[in-house]
Amino acid sequence: FLLCFCPILNRCPLVRSVSSLQNLEQAVRAEVEAKNYIKIPDLLISSDACQISNPFSFFSSFPQNIRVQIVDEMLQSLIPIRPRSKPQLTYSYLLSYTLQSSHPFPLALAVLQRTLRSGCLPVPQTHVLLSSAWLDQRCLSHSVANILLQMQSIGYHPDCVTCNYLLSSLCAVDQLEEAVKVLRGMGGAGCIPDSSSYGTVIGAMCRVRKTAKALNLMKQMVVQYGLTPGQGTLVKLLAALRANREIWKAVEMIEFLEKESNSVGFESYELVIEGCLEKREYVLAAKVATGMTERGFIPYIRVRQKIIEGLASIDEWKLACAVRQRFAALKS
C-alpha cells in the first residue's frame, strides 16, 4: 500500500535504487536496536527516498511481544520531541505498518492514539487501512468493547478521541452500520460518546439521506447522554429532511430540541421555513417563524414576504396579520 506522507516524498521519482531503500531501513533498524528512537524522525525526514516499502517492515522478523515492546518504547520516546509535528512521518509509517500486519490490534490503536495526542493527523489513506483491519477483526466475532479493551493488555487505555477517529474512518468508507455499532458499543470500553461522535455518524447518515436513522441518533444523544448537538450537525440533518421532502419531521425535530432546552440557530430555522414554503405549508412556516422570533431571530425579508403572501393566498388573513405584526414588533 503506497503512502506518500509529505510534499518532499511526493516529488520523488518512483524509481529509486534498492540500495538507498535498504540503507534507510538498515539505518532505522540500527537505531531501534540501539534504542536511539529519538533519532528516527530525523532519519526519515532527511531521507530523499520515495518509500515504496515501509522502513519498519523489519519489525515482522521480531516475535509479537518484542514488537509490542519496541513500538511502545518508541512511542514514549517521541512524546517530548519538539516541534510536536516532527515525528509525523514516524507515526505515519508505524501506523501503516501495524495496520497491515497480521495482528493489527491492539498495537495499531495505541499508535493511532499517540498520533492523535501529539496533534498529528494521520494521512487520509489511514481511513481505509483502519476500517479494513477493524472489519476483519469484527468478522472474528469480537465485540466492539472487546477490541478496544485489548489496548489495556499493552498498557494503553481506549479513549473517545481514538474512537471518534475510528468512527470517521468507517464513515469515510461508507460502513455506516458498523459505525453505529461502534457508537453504541464504545461505552462498554469506558469511552462515552460525545457530540463529535454522534455528529460524525449523523452527518454521514445525512449525506446518504438515511434520515430515519439520523433522527434516532439525534434523539438518543440528547435524551440518553444529555449532549447538545452542534449547529453544523443539526443543519445537515434538517437539510437532509428538506431534501427528502420530510419537512414535518424537520419541524418536529426543532420542537423536540427546544423542549429539551437545546439551542437552535438562525440557519436551522431559516432552512426549515424555506422547506415549508417549498411545500406550500404556509401555516407551518408561520408557526416556525413565530417560534424563531420568540428566540430573538427574524427571518430574512424575502422569507417574511413569502410567508405573508402564502398565508394570504390560502385565506389565512388573521394569521397573516398576526405574523406581520410580530415581525414589525421585533424589527422595532
Protein language model regions, located:
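N-terminal targeting peptides
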Residues: F1-L121, Q125, C139-H142, L319-S332
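Pentatricopeptide repeat
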Residues: S20, L24, I40, N54-F56, ...
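Residue-level detector of the short coil/turn that links helix A to helix B
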Residues: K35, I66, S102-H103, R138-C139, ...
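Alpha-helical solenoid repeat scaffolds, predominantly canonical TPR units
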Residues: L43, M74, V111, I147, ...
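Inter-helix linker motif
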Residues: Q51, R82-P83, G119, G155, ...
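C-terminal interaction modules of eukaryotic adaptor/scaffold proteins
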Residues: E278-S332
